[in-house]
UniProtKB/Swiss-Prot annotation:
Main subcellular localisation: cytoplasm
Organism this protein belongs to: Exiguobacterium sp. (strain ATCC BAA-1283 / AT1b)
Subunit structure: Interacts with translational regulator CsrA and flagellin(s).
Similarity comment text for this entry: Belongs to the FliW family.
Stored InterPro entries: Flagellar_assembly_factor_FliW, Flagellar_assmbl_FliW_dom_sf
Protein name: Flagellar assembly factor FliW
Location(s), subcellular: Cytoplasm
UniProt superkingdom: Bacteria
Amino acid sequence: MFIETDYFGKIEINEAETITFVSEIPGFPDSKTFVLIPYGEDLPFWSLQSIEEQACAFVVTNPFWHKSDYAFELSDGAKDQLGIEEAEHVSVYSIVTLREPFESSTLNLKAPIVIETKERRGKQVILDDAYPARYPLGGTKAEVR
């Protein structure tokens, strides 16, 4: 299957690798199906690209690489929506807000993207935990407000 993207142009994707979101990412009601496209083999970033909307894409990364003590408990409702039965079938990503200079970029730890990897269902979860929506990408600077 071919899709058009703003960042990568026209690319071929494996339809079996698409992720269906069980609820919309806030502000993007027309995008329900996404695919993760790596920015490069040596880079820890992906584009979470909408299949339905060419211009809808989010830079994401694994939050545990940037904050090793990041932890949260999913609600039973979220687990049910995603069909999560085992933790080994879950991937978590954080949306990155890119800034100039790059070192000023931040992660949204408050609202991670949770993906059940067997059935490929996704959801952006808003956490009650005290995590910031703008955590410094390097994790060493003071929190950006």
